[in-house]
Amino acid sequence: NLELTMSPLDNDNWSVSVELPDDIGEFGYRYIVRDCDNGNERHEWGAPHRFIPPAKGTGTITLYDHWNDRPEGNPYYSSAFTECICARRHRDGKTIPAKGHVTIRVSAPMVKPDEVLAISGNLPAMGQWDPRHAVRMSDAGYPVWEVNIDVTSLTFPAEYKFLSLKKDSGEVSAWEYGRNRTLYIHKSDSLQQEAVVVDGLHFRTGGTPWRGAGVAIPVFSLRSEDDFGVGDFMDLKLMVDWAVRTGQKFVQLLPINDTTMTHTWRDSYPYNANSTFALHPLYLRISELGRLDDPVRQKYYDNMATELNALKEVDYERAAQGKAEFTREFFAQDGELTVNSNDFKEFVERNRKWLMPYAVFCVLRDRHNTSDFSCWGEFAVYDERKATRFAEDNAYDINYVYFIQYHLDRQMRHVRSYAHAKGVALKGDIPIGISRTSVDAWQSPQLFYLDSQAGAPPDDFSVLGQNWGFPTYNWEEMSRDGFAWWKARFRKMSEYFDAYRIDHILGFFRIWQIPLDAVHGLLGVFHPALPFQPEELRERYSFWLDPDLHASPYIMDHFLADFFGEYAEEARSRFMNPAGYGRLKLKEGFNSQRKVTEYFAHEMKTSKNERLCSGLMGLIDNVLFIEDPYEKGKYHPRITAQYSY
């Protein structure tokens, strides 16, 4: 990479001259502002500028560039608009800078497919402000539009504006708002021998922002005659067709990542993925793979599909198991052809960083009958070399997992291309957390606080708060490699989606974090937050914090009946020890909500046991302060403590 230092011309303009070889090709470049004192840098927004070599015989090219700040309407530069809603299917020829010409380039992503951008100004070469004679621009570099104007037809300063026209009728769709632009180039004898490029402009849209309708739906809710009892990726094509007929521009999906943990209906929750990269095998259209050579076995699966499709509700377990059985048989029949293909090998190599660990995870999960990797013996802690060796030693099973992901990827990419061709954008969903028994937690545990849980504080709809069970993000650790995990995740999602819904976006900045041994959300604290030091409470609020009294469950004999009713005496004798002065402490086996729920999970479900369990959970919530999990000896007030005892 070459770095050039620029020199100031005045308060607003900087310049640099550079000699380039005659055979130089197209390349990208950026501008950087660097603080000479501390080295801090400010970078431009968006994609790099592009240098397009001028036509042969051009000795000098002068670039009048602009620093690229985040533009007004920057979402319009996303693929949802540039590759879908406003995509240009048939492009004009490229405009090449040439001597004796001024090339003007402007970014305008929101010009509709049936429109064209034009330039109009106060000179005859620009149509003299008459839209009928405005000079149409090329969309070859869309969302950048460009036009060449003969320098001999220009006088400086020239005034001009950009406008959008209907392609066929020439009717004006919109003038850009604001004052006229000014084009000023110092005219000299050599001007006709050089190429001049004015770049970095942005169409000033103004007016009402773009509005569009869309629909949100889980993939599993889509149904068609070609299903196998549950919606799949190929059903999305029908959804896109419906969106087109109803004038909608977005189809939003729930998360589509693999959630297989137990091979039961408990895996149906789409926000508890075992991988943030792998797609869900449930959404594979198995008929797209082909048919089994054995007509009896193929008939068996055809009948199963008919039976499952006739059900009023999805039979999650049978549909998932049926697809798994079919793909196993089909892989045994034709898998080798796919595995040996160049396209398959390229897919595996391109995705190896997440795909190999995911495949090993799936095989180990099934062999150990649990996704809890702490139960996997020598594989409980992820080791790259061990995982690689395991993949090599179990190539058949690993390749089967690759095979499924390969076809899921092909089908989802096909659907996205289909949607783009129809002008419909696909919108994905980014869950707030990851599963603590996922490939991500196994492969990169340092990126997560696995000893905590994400949730939400109490409100009028959930007085005990919410506990989602996901580990929270270790942002400090993630920052060490420039958030590589997040970048890889977004890159993968961008292969299938044009926009994202971010689940619980506030939690990415400040999360409600709950201890792992808690069940209710009441015992959580915000992270990050500033906890109190005991001396701060004494000096500023005259409050003497006693951790044993204020940060431990406060249990007094006289209010046990409020928690346990007629079972108060039994609760005292079974679960508590006296601590003096009418105070009680919970026994070791019942001093956390996790221990209590695990104990009663093995007891009979009776109203008495429900009351005992609920009472114990409430007593454990009965604290005034919670110790900070990272700064021991510092404390947070328990939320809604005013309602406690």
Region locations from a protein language model:
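A short, polar/charged loop/turn motif at coil->beta-strand junctions and beta-hairpin connectors
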Residues: 10, 98, 113, 131, ...
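Extracellular interaction modules
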Residues: 56-63, 68-69, 185-193
